[in-house]
Amino acid sequence: MVQVVEAFGKPHVNVGTIGHVDHGKTTLTAAITKHYGNFVAYDQIDKAPEERKRGITIATAHVEYQTEKRHYAHVDCPGHADYVKNMIVGAAQMDAAILVVSGVDGPMPQTREHILLAKQVGVGYIVVYINKADVSDPDMIGLVEMEVRELLSKYGFPGDEVPVVIGSALKALEDDDGEYGKKSIDKLMERLDDYVEVPPRSVDLPFLLPIEDVFSISGRGTVVTGRIEKGEIKIGDEIEIIGLKATQKTTCTGVEMFKKLLEKGSAGLNVGILLRGTKREEVERGQVLAKPGTITPHRKFKAEVYILKKEEGGRHTPFFANYQPQFYLRTTDVTGSIKLLEGKEMVMPGDNVSIEVELQVPIAMDKGLRFAIREGGRTVGSGVVSEILE
């Protein structure tokens, strides 16, 4: 039996904005909160000081809003190529993505990379918002829409049926009553409600939460945050902290979401979990919290991987056995060594191959876990664990 989680009395969906730098992701996020949530201004979403100076978003901002039908938690993912690493963490928390594409420029390199990443980290649905329509012309917008649909199909999304909304996030933010203003946000919310199915949550599976961040709250102890991937957790539940170092046991002494205390946390929700007697330095991002005995840490596995072509932003040259890139698994990056299987001398950009990987540190994993392969600040491949070796 699969259960749909409710939040605030409505079905709950995790969404987020993806797309090229300066195409309007953060402006759109602000506009949605203005009309459907508690308004969060552009510069609040774009918070950290060093980010605003460069006019690009590095951190992942969390906001919430609701339609008549649903409650949405929304992450504004970084758009700049240098911050794809962070985006992988953001995208991992999305049931659906709002792909923002400028109607003036059309799809750009990061548009492609974000679509690829969305596919790879298991984002189920994409809804497109063609932005800056007020300063583009209808012919250009038609071309942009065609190009975006083709691109989505190329990366495995149903390009022909993906909803496309045309508007201006800035006009919507300025409360403009025209077609491209607030009405485009209404239309976008309608499309999200109608097109994106509320994902069946794995609440009946054993509890698992990949740790994204760790805080120390004076007088209360250590809190870890992240999105519950499977199962549910209640106060008093025993849990294990797995990966990177020896497995530790602890107990959950509190669950909270958006600063509200919950009786329990269930799959799909972004929560903070208070841990009994655990020191801040004993836990780190990249580990997971799980029901005792349900998942184990491993260093060696077999995987099916796709290595990006040069045109997709991948490597320009082949790689050979013992190549050592970074593997992004859930919320962390770990260096690993690649072993090619018999009869394979080298792997060319564009190849789809079976490989064996040996990580430098153990990570909690099971079959079916997806990951990205990165080097020198860029994605060079994607893969899925096909078999655990040890």
UniProtKB/Swiss-Prot annotation:
UniProt keyword annotations, A-Z:
Cytoplasm, Elongation factor, GTP-binding, Hydrolase, Magnesium, Metal-binding, Nucleotide-binding, Protein biosynthesis
Q: Where is this region: G2?
A: 55-59
Gene Ontology MF term list: GTP binding; GTPase activity; guanosine tetraphosphate binding; translation elongation factor activity
This enzyme catalyses: GTP + H2O = GDP + phosphate + H(+)
**Residue ranges occupied by any tr-type G domain in the UniProt entry:** 10-201
* Principal location listed in the UniProt entry: cytoplasm
Q: Where is the region G3?
A: 76-79
Q: Which Pfam families match?
A: GTP_EFTU (PF00009), GTP_EFTU_D2 (PF03144), GTP_EFTU_D3 (PF03143)
EC number per UniProt: 3.6.5.3
Would the keyword Iron be found if you checked this record's keyword annotation? no
| Region of interest (G4), ranges | 131-134
Q: List every stretch annotated G5.
A: 168-170
Give residues annotated as binding Mg(2+): T26
Listed under GO cellular component are: cytoplasm
Q: Name the segments for region: G1.
A: 19-26
List locations, semicolon-separated: Cytoplasm
- Top-level taxon in the UniProt lineage: Bacteria
Per UniProt, where does GTP bind? Answer: 19-26, 76-80, 131-134
The UniProt entry's sequence similarity note says:
Belongs to the TRAFAC class translation factor GTPase superfamily. Classic translation factor GTPase family. EF-Tu/EF-1A subfamily.
Task of the protein: GTP hydrolase that promotes the GTP-dependent binding of aminoacyl-tRNA to the A-site of ribosomes during protein biosynthesis.
Q: How does it assemble?
A: Monomer.
What is the name of this protein?
Elongation factor Tu 2
UniProt organism field:
Wolbachia sp. subsp. Brugia malayi (strain TRS)
The lineage is:
Bacteria, Pseudomonadati, Pseudomonadota, Alphaproteobacteria, Rickettsiales
Q: Which gene encodes it?
A: tuf2
